[in-house]
Amino acid sequence: MEPGFWHEKWQQQLIGFHQQDINPFLVKYWHTLALPAGAQVFVPLCGKSLDMCFLAEQGHQVIGCELNELAVQQFFEDNQLPMQQSALGEHQHYHTEQVSLYQGDIFTLPASITGKVSGFYDRAALIAWPESMRAQYAKQLAQLLPQGSVGLLVTLDYPQEALSGPPFAVSPTWVETHLSDDFDIQLLDCQDVLADNPRFVKKEVPWLNEAAYLLRRR
């Protein structure tokens, strides 16, 4: 998935992947991570997700990484948050009291930025990558996370041949095969969400499962 693809999507506001509401699995299961208020939480490929507002409301310090500048700017504008901007190497750093977003390539994000995080949340990152690039992202995520950090992973799974991603289908088998070397994995929930996703219904995708996993960095 080339950077130009995502920049074009944001420029044209073709952002069907952006959810207008907080993810239900986040609301339902975040407490199972048992993170204290004040804990740093990393959100990879964060876009302008409202989920970051939920995490901040839990008292966390949110650290996000997003490739597209417009997405980062819209997060602060849409939520009427004052922010400051500064350069950090090849990344731009946008921050307010509880949210720090780093605009740039996650593969070149300095590990020092996430060195003190104790939690992480991935709803739209893993499923954004085609299978040919997904394992590389998963390894980069693991390298950015300290040992013992805990996170909530949300995936979508469906017959990939029925629809071209993103979001791409990520099966439970893929999660176990590619993440188990770096994470302890616990499946928390899996639900059929086809009726809630008109794009998939329109394309006659036969089923669509959303799953939530608790991950712990080994």
From Swiss-Prot:
Which InterPro entries does this chain map to? SAM-dependent_MTases_sf, Thiopur_S-MeTfrase_Se/Te_detox, Thiopurine_S-MeTrfase, TPMT
The listed locations are: Cytoplasm
Enzyme group, top EC level?
A: transferase
Which GO BP terms sit in this record? methylation; response to metal ion
Q: Which EC numbers does the record give? A: 2.1.1.67
Q: Which UniProt keywords apply?
A: Cytoplasm, Methyltransferase, S-adenosyl-L-methionine, Transferase
**GO molecular-function term, one example from the UniProt record:** thiopurine S-methyltransferase activity
Family matches, as Pfam families:
TPMT (PF05724)
**What cellular component terms from Gene Ontology apply here?**
cytoplasm
Which residues take part in binding S-adenosyl-L-methionine? Answer: 10, 45, 66, 123
Q: Which reaction does it catalyse?
A: S-adenosyl-L-methionine + a thiopurine = S-adenosyl-L-homocysteine + a thiopurine S-methylether
- Which HAMAP family does its entry note? Thiopur_methtran
Protein name, UniProt field = Thiopurine S-methyltransferase
